Every structure is written in structure tokens, then in C-alpha cells.
Amino acid sequence: MGANAVLRKRALEDIATTGTDPETGASHRRYIQDRTVIEDTESSVDLVKRGWQLFNYPARLSYSATPPDFGALVIQRRRWANGGLLIMPKLLGLLIQRPLRRRSPEAFMRVHYLTSIAAVNVGLVLLFLFPFTDWLANEWLPLTAVAYFCLYAHDLRLAGYRRLDLFRVYALNLMLIPVNLGGVFRSLQQAVTKRTATFGRTPKVENRTAAPAIYVLAPYALTAYLCSAAGFDLFEGQVFPAIASGINASLLFYALSTFVGWRDSAADIVRKPRSRLRAGA
């Protein structure tokens, strides 16, 4: 399921649970467990566990407002990145109980959907921060990403965008690495503390939504690091790693200037320290 779905009432009845309000003592039925902030994803696993089938309709059923600024986007994407790891044990239990032999592609897609945000973003950070010089120097390595980017560009084209928008999307995804990791960290925090994370609703306000300073500073720090890594690799004669770091740094620089803006990013960075100084005074 997603933000838009058509459900059968019998299906909801099958996954419903009965609970008691701790304050009033009244009993109630809960159809969506609301254990994570991506409750629709967990409900889809519950439906499959009960033997129901889910069908994807590859078209827009409705339109949702796009986050107007980086601060609102941070809230949305951090929420989307939170919950997949928490649902994974339930999915693995389902796969163990009911081996999906003929539905192995479905199992692969479900596992990938729940774990990809954590795996991809952690993998990118490791790739950026640790010197895999001999591996990156292999000229065949860039070809491994060609199929992925070709399919990505094809999907963008089918959705009505230009294929060249692929570079803008990739730049945005680079800038969102700290945000996605923040959502993954909240999943781990909930797993340890057993406290359900607060649902951060995407703001729909006229004024700009300020972004937490950490999510603005981190892309700047990563850009500076990639620039220095490109210079160091070039000095050492490592051409392919230098090109890769230079391209990623350039795309991050573009993302910061286009999707955040220099003035707004500066305002977000100094906003909290100033408020603390005033409060202390």
C-alpha cells in the first residue's frame, strides 16, 4: 500500500486487533497498527501474512503537495527512512513460515524496499570516507552503475520528466544522505528504547520551514571532503577515484545552491546558536 490505496473491508477485518484504552478502559479495534511512522508499509506485510494479495496500479491516483523547501523535505524524507528495519523481522518471519519459492522476486523486492535506504546510504558513506583506492582505480567499476542509471532515466522519462533530470535527482539524493541516516538512526533508537517515534508530518505552511543545522552542515562537510579527496587522488595519479570524487562534489555543490540556497542554509546554521545565546542572556 502507499498513500493511496483501495482496500476491501474484509481485509481490514482480518488484520484488526482489539485493545483497551488505558485511560478510559473502553475497548476499541485497531486496523492499522501504527507501530512505525510508515504504518502503510507494515500493514501491507500484515495483509500478505493473512493471505491477501496486493496489486500495484502504476499510475497516480491523486496528487500530493511537494515539499516547498529543504526544511519540509527533511521532515518528509527522515520519516520515510524510519521504520523499514523495524518491519524487517516481521517480513523475515513471514518468509520463513511461507517460503516464497515461486514468488522469490516478490520477496526480493520486499526485502530490498525495507533495507535499501539503510544499506545504500551507509554504503555510500563508507565508499566516500574510506580509501578503496585499488578497487576504485578499476576502470570497469563505473560500468556497474550504468544499468542502474539507464533504468532510472527510463523511469523518469515514463513519469514525464527529462532524462537529464537524472543528474538533478542524483544530486538531491547525495544531499539527503545525512537525512536518510537520521531516519535509520531513529529506527535503531526505537528498537532499543521500545518507544514509538513521533510522526513528523510534512509542513504545509506559507513560510519557509527551517532545517536542522546538522542536515545543512553535513552536505557542506561532505562536499569539502570530496574536493580534498579529488585533489589528493589526482596528486597520487589515481585518475578514476579523482574523477568520481570531483563529480560527486560538483553535484553536491549544485544541490546546495539549488535545493537549499546559500542564504537559507546560512540562516539555518546560525539560527539555533543565536537563539541559545539570547536565551542565556
State each model region's role:
Residues 1-159, 163-166, 170-180:
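Non-transmembrane catalytic domains and loops of membrane-associated enzymes and transporters
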Residues 83, 191-205:
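Juxtamembrane inter-helical linkers in multi-pass membrane proteins
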Residues 113-195, 210-278:
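Membrane-embedded multi-pass helical conduit in multi-pass membrane proteins
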